[in-house]
Design a protein with these regions (language model features):
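Carbohydrate-active catalytic/glycan-binding domains of CAZyme proteins
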Residues: 1-170
Length: 170
């Protein structure tokens, strides 16, 4: 692969914002990103900038016209043998997740973890899950002061059920 910067036709080839990185148990490194379309690739772990030939994929979370369709902000995690992608869907007040048996997908939409409601109709939500001392949490942000520029960090306990689902935080 050849690294290129500021490709003029970047919208035709994807908009690569809000990257999330997963280092798998075998040491392989995967990057997930996107805006109105999801992308992933494997990086050469020796230099961390070269894309492994043949690894680039588009629409790892299927593009849909529904409110759960991918918008931006991929955050990958591995829980047991299941790969999770937490992302901001088209309804920006929510954090959705999709799962797969492989870091390269295919990923299947599973539901919402957080819904901020009508905090700010033009805002979005970014965040991820993390296990601390055996307890799983979701870290995310909400709008405050009725402004997209005023965000406050939040954390909630979550539960990952045996079937891999994560009930929505109430």
């Amino acid at each position: 692969s050849q690294y290129q910067y500021n490709i003029p036709d970047h919208y035709d080839n994807g908009t690569f914002i809000d990257p999330g990185v997963l280092v798998d148990d075998d040491g392989r490194v995967y990057v997930y990103c996107g805006f109105l379309g999801s992308y992933m690739c494997e990086l050469n772990g020796d230099n961390m900038y070269e894309v492994v030939d043949g690894s680039y994929q588009t629409d790892i979370i299927p593009v849909t016209e529904t409110e759960d369709g991918f918008f931006e902000a991929c955050s990958p995690r591995k829980v047991g043998d299941t790969y999770y992608l937490i992302y901001s869907p088209k309804i920006g007040s929510r954090l959705a997740y999709a799962t797969s048996d492989s870091p390269t997908g295919p990923f299947t939409y599973r539901g919402y973890i957080v819904d901020n409601g009508a905090d700010y109709p033009g805002g979005n939500n970014h965040g991820s899950i993390c296990q601390i001392n055996g307890q799983w949490y979701i870290f995310y942000h909400r709008m405050t002061n009725g402004s997209i520029m005023s965000r406050r960090g939040c954390v909630e306990r979550i539960e990952i059920l045996e079937d891999g689902t994560i009930p929505t935080v109430e």
